[in-house]
UniProtKB/Swiss-Prot annotation:
InterPro entries: Glyco_trans_2-like, Nucleotide-diphossugar_trans, TarS/TarP_linker, TarS_C1, TarS_C2
SUPFAM superfamilies in the cross-refs: Nucleotide-diphospho-sugar transferases
Function text: Attaches beta-O-GlcNAc (beta-O-N-acetyl-D-glucosamine) residues to the C4 position of poly(RboP)-wall teichoic acids (WTAs). Mediates beta-lactam resistance in methicillin resistant Staphylococcus aureus (MRSA) strains.
Cofactor: Mn(2+)
Organism: Staphylococcus aureus (strain Mu50 / ATCC 700699)
Protein name in UniProt: Poly(ribitol-phosphate) beta-N-acetylglucosaminyltransferase TarS
Effect of residue 95 to A: Loss of activity
Cofactor note: Can also use Mg(2+).
Effect of residue 94 to A: Loss of activity
Domain note: Contains a trimerization domain, composed of stacked carbohydrate binding modules, connected by a linker region to the catalytic domain. The trimerization domain appears to be dispensable for UDP-GlcNAc hydrolysis activity, but it may increase poly(RboP) binding affinity.
Gene that this sequence comes from: tarS
Pathway: Cell wall biogenesis; poly(ribitol phosphate) teichoic acid biosynthesis
Quaternary structure note: Homotrimer.
Coiled coil stretches, renumbered: none
């Protein structure tokens, strides 16, 4: 028996299928060990003619449906029934695979006896792909000890006998999310599920005019698939507690990432009864005991979806978005919420950390100014206080910066270097946090991972003079989590900055090892017996110009003892 059957459903794929076929022809794996099964859904272009050109390069099976099925399910089923490989790999016609995919997968499967193998995906042309389950290669994972439930597309490798023996095929009557039902069935029936993440093996490509994805799918059709998945989980040959946990995790996924997320705030009011009825049919298939296992903020949504109560369902989603509730209190760090008069209290709802976006970050040798916004926070403005926290990497020292400006939930903090420079030498690295306080509860969030474009090149720094010593302050983004931190270290001025006279009344400061930013404005140079005023301007990231109010002689230039900017003095002698 050959090792693999690569299954490719096609429909009007002439513009991009060559890339896939080339990737299959270039496989670093014996051509006798895999077949390519192409089933065409009545293309009206040159798709099949292009495929036929690969007869001598690939072990091809090609067929065409008599009538267009309107979705990839039927072509995949026809191909699966034809498959002779020990394993099948489903590949969409607009995607392609790494030349080592089949070779590495075969070796991994032989070693670990996998029934389902997830291979690491990479998005191309802005295509989003699941990533969280591909952090590392794992010979065996489950639906509960991994993130595989968050990838239910069929683009994986399956043991053919697993699918055929358990009658796992794509439901052809369903035109939306049918692949999720297929993949969940495979997960539930597999003896071993594995993840191969050594490299990118599957390239998912964003194309224009994709086949089935843009067609309208009614709420009834969509939620019927979700209901069938719930039923499939509940009917699995597993312990009840285990099934309930899997179903709860599926609900977490569904309400977080599917079209259900925020639907009552997006769908037209006149269409919402149709949606809640279909969603309610799905949720009514979920036993109420499972509600206790889902993310706590979903429990009110499950309650009102099961009751098909669109008005209160909408109130919950709107309340979460605004962070405003009919009644609420916080007990032991959790929310107790009543969403409407006469409605039940929902207790013990976790307060998720807010997401913080750094919308601005500017600095010079005088101050650091950063602006932050809070996103997706369950508590509305007016119920919490914010402050910036600088915490030393060794966690021995902490500095707090109060809020300077609140402009429509845009929080600005001014870190005055004159106020904190005496504390900075105590530690080289200072991490930046936003603290959000609600009563006695404090939430701490690192800053910088989400941000607008950073205005400086890497290593751009500020020059600070403290107790006759010079230091540089360098903001940077951490390697692992891409958050902003401040690096503070002593330097030798002559190794870092050059100072030259240009003409008779301009002084040019140039960074030698990196760019240095200075506060623009009034400045002065102090000689042994004179002081000359000037205007400092940043002409580039590593060059500063001081335009003096009068000429200075070269011999006097060599005797400058101090340089004063608006808020910093640099002793040069």
């Amino acid at each position: 028996m050959m090792k693999f059957s690569v299954i490719v459903p096609t429909y009007n794929s002439e513009k991009y299928i060559t890339e896939l076929l080339n990737s299959l022809a270039k496989q670093d794996f014996p051509k006798t060990e895999f077949e390519v099964v192409v089933v065409d859904d009545c293309s009206t272009d040159q798709t099949l003619q292009i495929v036929e050109k690969y007869r001598n390069k690939l072990n091809l099976k090609v067929s065409q449906l008599e009538t267009n099925s309107g979705g990839p399910g039927k072509p995949r089923n026809v191909a699966l029934k034809q498959a002779e490989g020990e394993f099948v790999l489903f590949v969409d016609s607009d995607d392609y695979i790494n030349k080592e995919t089949l070779k590495d997968a075969a070796a991994f499967i032989d070693e670990h006896h996998s029934d389902v193998l997830l291979i690491k995906m990479k998005g191309v042309n802005g295509r989003g792909v699941p990533q969280s389950m591909f952090k590392e290669t794992a010979p065996e994972v489950t639906l509960l000890n991994s993130r595989i439930i968050y990838t239910l597309s069929p683009t994986k490798i399956y043991r053919t006998a697993l699918l055929k023996d358990n009658d796992i095929y794509f439901p052809e009557e369903l035109k939306s999310a049918e692949d999720q039902l297929f993949t969940m069935k495979a997960y539930l029936n597999a003896n071993r599920i594995s993840v191969l993440s050594d490299k990118a093996y599957y390239y998912a490509t964003k194309r224009e005019g994709e086949h089935m994805s843009s067609a309208y799918v009614s709420p009834e059709d969509f939620y019927e698939v979700m209901r069938l998945i719930a039923v499939e989980i509940l009917n699995a040959d597993l312990e009840e507690a285990h099934k309930d946990q899997i179903l709860a995790e599926f609900l977490n996924r569904h309400f977080s990432f599917s079209r259900t997320n925020g639907f009552s705030l997006k769908v037209k009011l006149e269409e919402q009864p149709q949606w809640i009825n279909a969603l309610g049919d799905f949720i009514q298939a979920v036993p109420e005991r499972v509600d206790a296992l889902v993310m706590s903020k979903l429990r009110p949504l499950l309650h009102y979806a099961r009751a098909k109560d669109i008005d209160n369902y909408r109130t919950v989603e709107e309340s979460y978005r605004q962070g405003q509730y009919y009644r609420f209190d916080i007990v032991d760090g959790k929310l107790n919420i009543q969403f409407n008069e006469g409605e039940p209290y929902f207790e013990g709802i976790d307060i998720a950390k807010p997401k913080v976006k750094m919308t601005a970050f500017k600095f010079d040798n005088h101050k650091i100014v950063t602006e932050l916004t809070l996103n997706e926070f369950m508590i509305g403005e007016g119920h919490y206080d914010v402050r910036l926290k600088l915490h030393s990497r060794n966690k021995k020292h902490t500095m707090y910066v109060p809020l300077s400006v609140n402009a429509n939930k845009q929080y600005r903090f001014n870190i005055m270097l004159e106020d904190i420079k005496a504390y900075l030498p105590k530690e080289k690295i200072w991490d930046v946090f936003l603290e959000v306080q609600i009563g006695t509860e404090v939430f701490e969030v690192r800053v910088g991972n989400q941000r607008n474009k950073y205005a400086y090149t890497a290593e751009t720094s500020a020059l600070i003079h403290l107790n006759n010593d010079f230091y540089r302050l360098t903001p940077y983004f951490t390697k692992d989590f891409n958050n902003i931190s401040l690096y503070f270290t002593a330097i030798t001025l002559t190794d870092s900055i050059s100072m030259k006279l240009k003409g008779k009344n301009k002084i040019i400061l140039t960074g030698l090892d990196r760019g240095y930013v200075f506060e623009e404005g009034m400045a002065s140079v102090v000689l042994k017996d004179d002081m000359i005023m000037g205007m400092l301007s940043q002409t580039s990231e590593n060059e500063v110009e001081i335009l003096l109010s009068k000429d200075i002689k070269k011999r006097d230039f060599k005797n400058i003892v101090k340089l004063n900017t608006a808020h910093m003095t640099y002793s040069l002698k």
